Amino acid sequence: MLPVAVVALSLLGSASCFAQKPVRVYILSGQSNMVGMGDVTGRSSRWGKQFRDPVVSIYSGKYSPKADYDKLTPVESKKLASIGGTRPTPFPQGGTAVLRGFVKMETDGTYGFNPGYQASSYNIMEVAGQEVYRREPGKQAVRTGFPFTGGKTYPFKVTFLTSQANGLGWVGRTDIPGTLATLVKQDSKFPHLVDKQGQWTVRNDVTYKGVISAVGQGPLTVGLQGNTIGPELQFGHVLGDYHDEPVLLIKASIGNRSLGWDILPPGSKRFTFKDRTYAGYKDTPSSWIEGQPKKKVNWYAGKQYDDYVRAVHGVLDKFGSLFPQYKQQGYQVAGFVWWQGHKDGNPAHAGRYEQNLVRLIKAWRTEFKAPGAPFVLATIGFGGWKMDGPHLTVAKAQLAVSGETGKYPEFKHNVKTVEIRGFWRGVEVSPRNQGYHYNRNAETYMLVGNALGQGMVQLLKNRK
């Protein structure tokens, strides 16, 4: 059971309780899975072939909630060649528009509807007599999923509440296994992520700032990165619960990057593997055969490392203006978080991963003037316990640097690796077949974030 998080700073008391205590800054980095690829919901698509025989009827006068439009005679009715897409058949103008027809989904599941767009989104939609969508002017939309049997046809009706009416709309399955919405709102996991109204909770004591990619900024909540989450979500909850001080998460990450080339830390030397020479820091290209012309590329070993460092410094240098509420308190770099390794799944880079990781840990601490600051990392977990080949070499290298192994005495009590292969979830219980992104299963990202958070707390306690 994950720790139940405190939702809002207001529940802890006023912001004055944090006065004079520096904000605890955690720097998170890696590649695409640190960016965050856990799906929050299933993807919606524009209305299209699911909708059959659409007819729009126009009734006299403005919309009235007392009117029964199924019993009234329309002024005009028009069969529509199509609805949805990007250019639905235009509706006749004037009066109150009611769209009727039939809808069929090919796959069993619960589906959610978003009829209309902008001004035309003020409407009420029913499927088989059950209200699935309602948005009244000046109010937020209320949605209720409808359970479809694949291949079965159901009648639908959309009653528009204003003169703005059209056939635009979106639909998506809401019970896709492995999405955060399904895990939380249907499977009752991670209850601290929703409030009593079923809305995503907001942590006003934990601030997120993304650079390079996943560039949202604001109090920690679901949605800062659009429709995906990374490990920072649960990590932030764990550290927010642990600290009395405010917490700032700075995440510098981007996909398709290797430690052996893109994020190669300063001090890394060239090496030879089989018949090729591999780049040291600032070298280009990534590898070459001695005596042969080098391929010209617009990149160099460690370029992404340099970009990460520059971006994080850009946040810290502007701390007071970016976070004026904490300007007087200042900040302290409290720790580092690392999750990366897929791109190093080749024999040459996998064999150097351990020494590159050791250099990265030392370089990160030196760069941000945080000697001995806790450094927690997660193994890769592709395929779970069935992992083999170069990726297994990478995972073993990640485990080797953990302080408790004793292999690196200077890392004792201040570096910890968490094993996450047990958090792998198969495609049959996940949103997509995308193994390099953990099948986009949000549970994996939550569990990784929790393990990283608990690991960081353990290291922090070691310092006391």
Model-derived regions, located:
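Positively charged n-region of N-terminal signal peptides that target proteins for export
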Residues: M1-V4, L239
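Bacterial N-terminal signal peptides
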Residues: P3-S14
